[in-house]
């Protein structure tokens, strides 16, 4: 698909972590264009029901349900991080995309591989930048577009 003769591609961000004693570490993050795979593997938890005078209603205040919702959110973020970083060709030791029980270990694994907390946070920022448009990026793109129009 094209918009105004421009082919649409996924957003990509690159993070280069310098290493003095070896090659620099390059992380490439791309936008996750669909969460269908995640939803198929990890459907949203359903609240247990309670019987009221008005009938059967979901009990969203149930402590067990709230824990499941929190875990679901953690897995969702982990999935986005892992899928976004696929172009980096990371050879995970414990994390596998096929096993959602391993997903939340991604940050622990980056740290145990030797990244500092700050570097791991930069990886997260890179992933978030690839998956979101902030106002600064939109303004920069708009200004560039308008400058091109003014020069015509």
Give a label for each model feature:
Residues 23-152:
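Short, surface-exposed, charged amphipathic helix/loop patches that serve as local interaction elements
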Residues 10-22:
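Short acidic-hydrophobic surface loop/beta-edge motif
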């Amino acid at each position: 698909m094209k918009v105004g003769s421009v082919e649409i591609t996924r957003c990509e961000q690159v993070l280069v972590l310098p290493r003095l004693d070896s090659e620099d570490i390059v992380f490439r993050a791309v936008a996750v264009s669909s969460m269908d795979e995640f939803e198929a593997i990890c459907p949203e938890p359903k609240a247990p029901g309670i019987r009221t005078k008005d009938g059967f209603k979901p009990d969203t205040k149930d402590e067990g349900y709230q824990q499941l919702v929190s875990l679901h959110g953690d897995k969702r973020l982990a999935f986005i991080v892992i899928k976004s970083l696929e172009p980096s060709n990371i050879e995970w030791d414990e994390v596998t995309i096929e096993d959602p029980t391993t997903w939340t270990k991604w940050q622990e694994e980056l740290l145990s591989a030797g990244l500092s907390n700050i570097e791991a946070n930069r990886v997260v920022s890179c992933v978030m930048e690839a998956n979101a448009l902030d106002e600064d990026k939109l303004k920069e793109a708009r200004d560039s577009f308008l400058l091109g129009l003014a020069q015509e």
